[in-house]
Structure formats: C-alpha cells, structure tokens
C-alpha cells in the first residue's frame, strides 16, 4: 500500500496548487502531457478524485484500470479541484456535497441490485457495505451514512481546501458470485463519487461532477497477495507481451462518468379538503353491499400504465404502485417500453417475486374483489330524514354514490379505499356507518363486514 504522504494531518500545510502538481506528475498524466494545450486545459473537469491504492498490472491497454482493496481496510480518496479558485465563484456556496457509493460493475447484477443488497443485509445484520473512517479523514464536514443505504456515505467539503475521505469496504467480491465451491472469481465493484452544489434554495441538488473506478475487494491481506501474483505473472511475460498491458500506477484516478441516477419522485396528490364541525362520517347505502359477481369484476383502480405514458409518467407509476426500488433501473423506460416486456424479462431483471408482481401490474391483472359496495359522503346540509327522501319532500341534492371494490373484508381496507376515493388521509376518517332499512346508522366493523358478505351470498 503506497501513499504520497505518511501523515494526512499535515495536508493543510500545503496549498492546493502544489498538491495538484503532485497529481499531474503521475505517469498516467506524463503520457498525455505533450498533448495538453490551453484549450484542452480549459476542458479539464472541475474536480478530480484519487484513490490511494495501486492499480493492477494485469490489465490490458485500452481497458479500464482495476484496483484491489482489502476488506475493512481504510483507503484514502483525495478530493481535488482542477480549476483556478476564480472559476468556483459560480458555485455561490463555500461547500459542495459528495456522495460515495460502492455499486456493481456487472450490468446483470445492476438489474438485481436491490435484491442482492437485501440478501447481503439479511446475511450480515447490523453491518454496512461502505463506511467512512472519520478520524483519518481530513477537511470533510457533516459525514452521514444512512441506515437504509448500506453502500453509500455523504459529506460536505470545501473545494478551495485540501480534503481527503478514508473509506472502508466491508463486503468482498465473492459474496455476490453464484453458489460458491471454492476458487471462484469475485465480481468487480465500482467506487463512484457524485458531487453536487447548492441550488437557489440552499439544497445540494445541482450536479457538478461524477467519477468512478473499478475495484475488487478481498479478505484482509488478500488484495496484497493478488497484486503480488499479478506482478509475478507479468514478470514472466516477454517484453513484447508486456507492451499489451498497462503499467501499475501507485494510485487510481477516478474517471468521469454519468451521475448515479438517484431521482426522488414526488407523486402529485390532490389537496386534502378542509372540514369544519364534526368528524367525517361516511354512509354506506341501504342494501348496497353485494358479493362479487362476474359482471362486477371491475378493475380495482384506474391507475393503469398506458402506452402513451412518458418516461416521467412511467417513473411516477412505478412509485405509486410500490415499485420504487426499480425506478432507477427503468429510468429511461417509457410506458410503451415497459408494456413490451415479457414476464420472463421482468422475472430475470427484478427477481421471481417482484418480477411477477410487476408483470401483473403492468398488464392490468387485478385481484377479483371479494365485495363491491357503494358509498357516499353525506354533508351536514344534505342530511334530511329518510322518510322525507322517500316521499320526495326532501332536498333534491341527494348524495352521489361511488363503487368500492374490497379485496379484504376488513374495516382498515374499507377506510383506505374511502380515503383514496376522496383524496384525504385515512386518519381523518373516524367512523364508517351502514344505513339500515329504517334509516338507522350502524357502525361498520370487521364482524359486520364478514356477516354482510355471508348473508348477501
């Protein structure tokens, strides 16, 4: 393990300009130095990240570098700015926020990332995939590690000052290979860093720069042995064969990439109506509860995915139908793209359970309801005696009834359906009444729903 400086605490004694010259003095930059011109220099990315771990010598030319890491060992990532300080005036803020992630390099595993990480969580309860070593880190503020995102950490830092984050990766590459029999090749990961600046509201949401590199993680000291093995293999090759491979660099430069597609989707919902006076009560019409009939096997909801749905509409549909974990996976899919996918495609991408559920949701295969009932919201000014309504002497503005299809004969399911129908919170509904033959109101309970279903059948 080679570092440029033995004491990270001394970084603040040097300015960022001299530190950047150290980075540009690496062999990888020396090869490109003759080609640099003022125009090319202006196109340099605003930031640069350097992982202080040696690259493998067994990587062919024109292939991406590969870096071996030891499980649980702290590795330094240096956060650098490439431009002059004057170029950072457009940031309108002193700090930027960086998010470091460890993700899969294999596209096949990217499709099932959620299931893979959940399986790892169950096999390693209480552990994290990625941690930040705060005591060793320099120049970072407000480091955070979400308990729900085991493979990501985030923090703030000042591009005008020296900053280094020390990370620890706790999962090894062979934990995600098919069933292990010994001697398998571990799957490669990626270390990706996404940096954001503040928007006009002070939120770190405006993307500034992203870069990543390929890694493999071994058990403690395994990375050192693998690096030595690769070096010995290269020494046995002829000079002509060695020309086909990259030299091993003491540090790993993260290369620019697209930002990680982590998008927060907000579902538009109708505003909750304001109510005055007594708590809300909803009436179930007299004799308007009926068992399921073939003619009444209507769709449970009208929220079907249409071929004309845009990419944004498809993302919101996934979110509304409890497929939020696949929003990033289908980030570029329109409604037509999703509708064209077969059951086998979705099972392979999402796993058996979620794949079948997503296929049924896309194709509009709904569960046949156990009961169909009709409800109305009876407003205070429209409440008149039942006899007056029958005689025609009451208010002509009668309640409008809506059909509700119940998959479960429980009060909770009924309240949730009513709340969804009227675009209010279920907590706003205190009781639900069923209006009897003589106009009496009976509080609806689970027992009453079950008995009504039995007697109606």
UniProtKB/Swiss-Prot annotation:
GO molecular function list: DNA-binding transcription activator activity, RNA polymerase II-specific; RNA polymerase II cis-regulatory region sequence-specific DNA binding
> Where does it live in the cell?
Nucleus
User: Would you name any one GO CC term?
Assistant: nucleus
Task: Output this protein's name.
Answer: Transcription factor CP2-like protein 1
Native source organism of the sequence? Pongo abelii (Sumatran orangutan)
Subunit relationships: Forms homohexamers via its SAM-like domain. Interacts with MTA1; which is indispensable for TFCP2L1-mediated self-renewal-promoting effect and endoderm-inhibiting action.
Outline the extent of the Grh/CP2 DB domain.
Answer: 43-280
Region: Disordered, residue numbers: 219-245, 271-301
CDD domains hit by this protein? SAM_LBP9
Q: Where is this region: SAM2-like domain?
A: 261-365
